[in-house]
Amino acid sequence: MRRVFLSTFFAATLTLSVQAQQTSKTVTLKVIETSDVHGHFFPWDFMEGRPLKGTLTRANTYINRERQKCGDNLLLIDNGDILQGQPCVYWSNYVIPEDENLAARVINYMQYDAETVGNHDIEPGHKVYDKWIREVRCPLLGANIVKEECKDGEADPENIYTGLQPYSVHIKDGVKICVIGMLTPAIPNWLNKSIWKGIEFEEMVGCARKWVKYIQENEQPDLIFGLFHSGKDGGIVTTDYEENATAAVAREVPGFDIIFFGHDHQVHNEWITNIEGKQVLIIDPSCWVRNVAEAEIELTIQDGKVVNKDIKGTIVNVEDEQIDEQMMAHFQKDIDAVKAYVGQKIGRFESPIYTRESFFGNSAFTDLIHNLQLQITHADISLTAPLAFNSTIKEGEVTMADMFKLYRFENLLFTLRMTGEEVRKHLEYSYDMWTNTMTSPDDHALRLNDDSKDDQQRTGFQYYTFNFDSACGIDYEVDLTKPDGQKVKILRMSNGEPFDEKKWYKVAMNSYRANGGGELLTQGAGIPKDSLDARVIFHTDRDQRHFLTEEIRKMGTVNPKPNHNWKFVPEAWVKPALERDRKLLFGN
């Protein structure tokens, strides 16, 4: 009997153990995110003509290594802003538009599992992004990118803009994952309606709430991820939406396990407690594929249900990874064609120009753009900001690559009607972001922020440098001893005529600014957002770089010089202060 009892006990124990093994298991998943690639596919800077660190060709080496470790348990996602940046995407978008889009081919080659649309994927215009959407093979996500007539409607996949999906579904080792993609709804503040005709952009918190509910009811997933082309917080905030709403969604919309995000070109890897007291990982790799964002998820599953989730977020630097030579060989013809394109000769400069000089007063770089804007539009006044932190165009032959350094974005060129007072207030708003109020000769002249030196859009300043507008066509002084809102004194028109704050002027600017970008026209000049369209006198049908290029071609030889139409005062204080700030920013 004892022997039988022992045998029976052993058999029962073995049966229970086998059942436990069958009903309980651990699954490990890995997710890798890229974001704000901006055409940084290959390890070559087509603008500067030199090697690049990072880029997708290096990231792909790391990704393939992780795929070998993880097998099918790896999810690769991209967070948008891929269609504008390096000249290779401009070449694909506009020079050879009949061919399959290069960005689509790169996404397909790397076998991404999902992609969210970014604002710089909308800016190239319907012809470009509609074709790109058709050519990308993985799900393209945009839960808040809806057909015009469907804004703020129910959660219905039929309401989403043609070719996009609100979310994607992925099964990994029996685990069901849903990825919700959203785009910052601030597009109308930057882009003319013609660029996004037929589309509306919903506020993110409300949109996330309805789609989480829909997914929980219809998909019953084990994990819900966000893939948001929207920064952590801040930016443009209106009564209708917040530009950077990732933190708000993480806090206010229960259901998310992880939110992968981007748009703000900053590294983030942190936890946020939502309104139910649960922790949500939010993670952002920043831009240009210097890093990837990685999440490792270990799930304990019992009886087919997830009973525990361990999540770890990591920012992985890929700047010095080995280049994926197979990927390079696959795209070598494209690389050679882009090099030939950017090598085209446009004209000749008799002297070099430097963007860095734009932060300290009149500069030949910024004033060349001002002068060309006035030539093209015949406006009275030009407004523009430095679009690069530290670029140089050397004297001698000017190539197409130099034109991308001169003007980095595919903005259109606009002319608006503005009163003299609005012009002054616009400039006040700009210089308030740009400069400090000095109370002693030892103060900073510029509004600097040590914490932003690694931020690719602030680069050591407190505010975005692409909002530092100066003006041409008027002579003025900026007094750094005056308080905000009282620094700018306009002396006269540059042609010698009086400047009148009550008079209407024709003012040239780019499309980003003309549509309210940076809020200089709205918060600064005081023009209501819904009145901006009525102020438009003229706009180009092609990007500004195209017209700047054509003007330089016509001129042949250009001798760029500062206009000397404005300056910082009092000079006894600001000159030494600017030199100190120059050393802090540039080291010399």
Predicted region positions:
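Bacterial Sec-dependent N-terminal signal peptides
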Residues: 1-25
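Acidic, metal/ion-coordinating pockets
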Residues: 21-320, 360-372, 382
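Catalytic centers of hydrolytic enzymes
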Residues: 22-30, 34, 39-49, 53-68, ...
